[in-house]
Each structure stands twice: as C-alpha cells, then as structure tokens.
C-alpha cells in the first residue's frame, strides 16, 4: 500500500489518504481487521515524512509500545481509499501517543487507533528523551491541552504493561 495526497489540513490534524487493495478485504467483504492497523501505520509514516522530513529534520526512530483499536463499522469494497486523521494526544518524556480516525469513502469514522510510540536510541535499542526539535513538531499536531502538559505529563512509556 502506498500513500497519496498527504495534506496537513490544520495545525492540529494531519490527514492522509491511503489506497486500499482488493487483498485488504476478507471473505465477508469487509476490510480485514489487520488492514486497519496497516493503514494506520502507513498514515503514521506519512505523518513522520510530512511533519519531520519536510521540515528538514530527521525522522525520529520509534518503537510501538501499545496499539489500541476500536472498530465501529465495516469498511466495504466501495471505498477505494481511506482517509486517516492523525493527532498527537499525549507527549511524555520518552514517548508520545497518536490518535487516528480511519474514515470510509463517505467520511464516516469506522475505526480509531491509539498508538503509544517510544523514542529510541537505535545504537542501544533503549528509550531516549524526546528532543526539543521533536517536541516542537509534535506539539504542532497536538490537541491544545497536550501542548500545555507536554513538559510535565507522566510518560506513557513508564506506566505498567498491564494498563
């Protein structure tokens, strides 16, 4: 799957259109549950390209710590591309959380994905602090409440794995 028509429609939301393939649909004629996670990942990659690389900044290395998916309604084969809105909803010391809404051809939200991503030092595979430049980019696509809490919020990566 490749991205197309990547746009940042406002200061708080990054919007991307991702084409869906025939093979993304299951035998029940619905977008397969794994395909939702794949298109969300592609949208996060487009987010990184558009928000970091386009500004001449390196794309931060991140590991996904947690993904939470809520399915509301099926996406049917009459949808040839999904629209995904990505917003940063929490920023900690070493991690940040994105909230993504996946919409069908009618603009109806069919699924949401919350993803905790941890900034890592690739040489050690260890968490590292989010840099000042990364924080600057992340707060540009963050909920306004997140911007005020960015330097004082508890780090989602430091919570127990049971949450």
Task: Give the residues covered by each predicted segment.
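Terminal targeting signals and extreme-terminal segments of soluble enzymes
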Residues: 1-83, 89-163
């Amino acid at each position: 799957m490749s991205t197309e028509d990547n746009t940042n429609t406002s200061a708080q939301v990054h919007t991307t259109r991702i084409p869906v393939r025939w093979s993304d649909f299951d035998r029940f004629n619905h977008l397969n549950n794994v395909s939702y996670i794949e298109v969300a990942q592609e949208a996060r990659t487009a987010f990184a390209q558009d928000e970091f690389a386009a500004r001449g900044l390196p794309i931060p290395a991140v590991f996904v710590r947690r993904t939470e998916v809520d399915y509301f309604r099926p996406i049917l084969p009459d949808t040839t591309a999904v629209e995904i809105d990505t917003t940063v909803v929490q920023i900690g010391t070493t991690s940040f959380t994105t909230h993504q809404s996946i919409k069908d051809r009618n603009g109806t939200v069919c699924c949401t994905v919350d993803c905790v991503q941890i900034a890592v030092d690739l040489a050690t595979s260890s968490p590292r602090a989010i840099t000042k430049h990364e924080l600057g980019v992340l707060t540009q696509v963050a909920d306004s409440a997140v911007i005020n809490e960015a330097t004082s919020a508890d780090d989602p990566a430091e919570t127990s794995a049971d949450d």
